Amino acid sequence: MRAALASALAVRPSEVVPWLRTRALQLIAQSGGSEARILGSVARGTDRPGSDIDLIVRLEPGRDIVDLLVLEEQLSDLFTFDVDVIADDSTGAVIEHARREAVPL
């Protein structure tokens, strides 16, 4: 009984994102962000209950790590899942791979 109830209450991040997309985009814009894209397990559709939400966001000039951290906190509160936000101007092989798999929020 307990396992069945827990299973019924388990929600994947990909099930929540469409419902909160508009508000998330508003928060991103208010933080100086645009062109938000999802990557990782949520983008691939392989997320599970407890998975986090990974985003790449283009930040306007003058925004810094503090703005990024505040945005992460706001989005985590909104989605009720951990959210990691990567600035689109990041460099390296990992971010290049992430850009290729990312899909629009």
Where are the language model's segments positioned?
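Catalytic core of pol beta-like nucleotidyltransferases
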Residues: 1-35, 43-48, 59-105
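Amphipathic, hydrophobic secondary-structure cores in small proteins
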Residues: 53-58
